């Protein structure tokens, strides 16, 4: 590798590359979530027949992974660069390798392996065929072909490419700690995120009000159901995300037993499934507007 890109240059390079492949550049969704997959730009758009190509950075919060800003590789919040393409291009893996080249990583000079790792998200009733991408022994990306999202079978097939930006930047810049990553010229990752990491870890493990969180989960669940009764998919899904993050805070705090944990996950999954079904029904009412006219007319005629 020659020039060592800053963190923000890595993002800009990936944005430009996937824009050139026909992806819309979306912005991070403004609700807490544990992974870019949970953004409505992936979760909702991966289901139903309409095409969808999007790329975006998604800050992802995982309270149980917080380490008070002291661990060089474990974080309360990390950043994913998410690419979703539906239908999946036949050359998606080749496109991915080309994106690495633009980041200064020559596939001919490095050990890049696709290691089978089928993906599942029990909280959203989602699963797919997947591979971890290992670069010289370190996982940097998750590749997934969705088979099921929100309990619904997917079709056409959606491919998802999730870059772990901190790991990728650590490799490109040859640093051992994420806090030493250069975010922008003269500004280190740690200068931005060490204090938030410490504070969120302290809150998640020591300070959070368990009673309040338990009450909030119940309230968010009720509100999601109320929104769904009115056919309001997006507000309902916002509350599903709030339920998920609240559960993650409870889990980090040790406030739920193993048995209770399974119950909470099932409750979130049930909500997500209703959201998914309602979304597809609403898109059908609209006539699946993102489909080309010929396919749209044919599909609607078949379904009628």
UniProtKB/Swiss-Prot annotation:
Catalytic reaction equation(s): tRNA(Gly) + glycine + ATP = glycyl-tRNA(Gly) + AMP + diphosphate
Entry-linked PROSITE patterns: AA_TRNA_LIGASE_II_GLYAB
Predominant place of localization: cytoplasm
Molecular-function GO term, any one: glycine-tRNA ligase activity
Domain of life: Bacteria
Gene Ontology annotations for the cellular component aspect, listed alphabetically: cytosol
Family, as annotated: Belongs to the class-II aminoacyl-tRNA synthetase family.
Protein name, per record: Glycine--tRNA ligase alpha subunit
Organism of this sequence: Streptococcus agalactiae serotype V (strain ATCC BAA-611 / 2603 V/R)
């Amino acid at each position: 590798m020659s020039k060592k890109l800053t963190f923000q240059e890595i993002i800009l390079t990936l944005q430009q590359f996937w824009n050139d492949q026909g992806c819309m550049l979306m912005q991070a969704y403004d609700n807490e979530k544990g992974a870019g997959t949970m953004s409505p730009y992936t979760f909702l758009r991966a289901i139903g027949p309409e095409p969808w190509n999007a790329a975006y950075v998604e800050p992802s919060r995982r309270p149980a992974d917080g380490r008070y800003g002291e661990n060089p590789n474990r974080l309360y919040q990390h950043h994913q660069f998410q690419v979703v393409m539906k239908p999946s291009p036949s050359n998606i893996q080749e496109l991915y390798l080309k994106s690495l080249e633009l980041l200064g990583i020559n596939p001919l000079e490095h050990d890049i392996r696709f290691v089978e790792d089928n993906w599942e998200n029990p909280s959203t009733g989602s699963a797919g065929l997947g591979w971890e991408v290992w670069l010289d022994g370190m996982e940097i990306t998750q590749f997934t072909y969705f088979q099921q999202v929100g309990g619904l079978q997917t079709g056409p097939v959606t491919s998802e490419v999730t870059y772990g930006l901190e790991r990728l930047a650590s490799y490109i810049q040859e640093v051992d700690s994420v806090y030493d990553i250069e975010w922008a010229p003269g500004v280190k990752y740690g200068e931005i995120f060490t204090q938030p990491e410490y504070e969120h870890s302290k809150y998640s493990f020591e300070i959070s009000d368990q009673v309040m969180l338990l009450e909030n989960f119940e309230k968010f669940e009720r509100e999601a159901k109320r929104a769904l009764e009115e056919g309001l998919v997006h507000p309902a899904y916002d509350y599903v995300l709030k339920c998920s993050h609240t559960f993650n805070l409870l889990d980090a705090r040790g406030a739920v037993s193993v048995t209770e944990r399974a119950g909470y996950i099932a409750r979130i999954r049930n909500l997500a499934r209703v959201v998914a079904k309602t979304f597809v029904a609403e898109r059908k009412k609209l006539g699946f507007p993102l489909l080309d006219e010929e396919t749209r007319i044919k599909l609607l005629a078949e379904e009628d």
